[in-house]
């Protein structure tokens, strides 16, 4: 008899009173996700399984009895869509944080790792997390790269790669299908990817940003069944009506009041409503929390606590096809969290597989890294750079005038045009403009760096560099001063990746991320401190204007699958037409001026 079968046999016996429970939780108020009730009950556990939920005080026979002292007992919380890489922590360090907050299961799309390492990146995600008490369900990334032909990452995934990954038992579905254009226009690659998911019988996650009407219907018809890219209350309502599972995310909190208001107008809060974090940086994960922070925001905006908990438990379990999770019921896995209040959720105790693993925000036993798994390093395949590499030039023009296309806007980008002066072969940056610069870092091509004018970020005072840039994770630098841009970039090349700020010839802040150029091997608290310091000091380089021109937007400046212009390692791209666009509209040579500024991009 298998160990699982033996546990179930023992659970049946214990439920009938023929043998004692391993653990009996008494004096609990059960938050019943099936009925919406809060009711007094005790919970008997055998091994990793709930054996019985029965009237309070009706059973006392157990090897161990624990009183929850009237606390509210909920199923463990579940995150239906997350990129662990956004925490910049390896899986065991990430798990140590979220487990203490009551999150016991996550659906991880490791497409950041996959865009650097290919299938090996997904294998690392599986191998590095399979031993953890956190239930980690890995998805097979569909966006490697997110927009083929417009960017080059460290690998290319199509049907064959998806079939390989979907054949692994730890892989539970197809990760967010970001190439909406390819799906809607019958791309052979995207048809292969989605069909591999359909053939596997596993989940197919969506990324339906901006889709509505006929295009949204077509996207669903292709086989996609969820979306976390909600942009408004109307968008959330339309996607629910269309039949998508919506994943309300915590990474865009400014949208939550309107989305909550829309949900409150509905006659029924469907099982199609779940929650996810998507991306949470390390300092916010530690200080505010992951899913728990989102749930508290939804409660603060007026949704009933039991409904909010249902989003993160039963609804999530239904979405993720996990019939062993999501309810406090006999036969389900004993992943449980205890709250002392339903007004503001704070995990007092967390049980995983029937074992107490965290109390009052502290893990009882630290988690070790997976034995025999070597984190991938040395992934920035770049030689040191010079300031000359960061000068914008117009070929063949030493002195003259040019009209250039440029990127306008921080989060929602639009095309712009501007006339610039050229002196001594260098474009003179117009007032209010900065530069964005991208270089391929995966060793798959040796193209020269790409550089473009950037409006809407103000005049950056120095440089910001990152090797964590959605979704191809090439080396990206923003700035106006070529010397500072080179300094920040070289800091990352030397450290194996991460983020850096430079100003007036000095490094203001640097967070090293030597694992795949996106994960740190620092203790979580130290990483959070360094990341917070870098974010705080970034205001010396940039003038932030929430909600769009914010520090987090740095990571998305090259996301070519989104509408509008973006710069990638292949050039200036258009998300709508799926074309690489020449930034040069027109230029002409003019006589050299007698006097001019000789340091336009290094000031």
State the predicted function of each range.
Residues 1-46, 51, 99-101, 286-302, ...:
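Active-site microenvironment of metallo-dependent hydrolases
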Residues 2-14, 92-203, 508-512:
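Divalent-metal coordination cores built from histidine and acidic residues
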Residues 28, 48, 70, 81, ...:
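Divalent metal-coordination and catalytic microenvironments
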Residues 74-80, 108-111, 139, 175-177, ...:
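Active-site neighborhood of phospho(di)ester-bond hydrolases with catalytic His/Asp-centered motifs
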Residues 110-113, 141-143, 179, 209-210, ...:
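Short, ordered loop/turn segments at secondary-structure junctions
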Residues 156-176, 182-248, 254-275, 284-300, ...:
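Histidine/acidic residue-rich metal-binding segments in metalloenzymes
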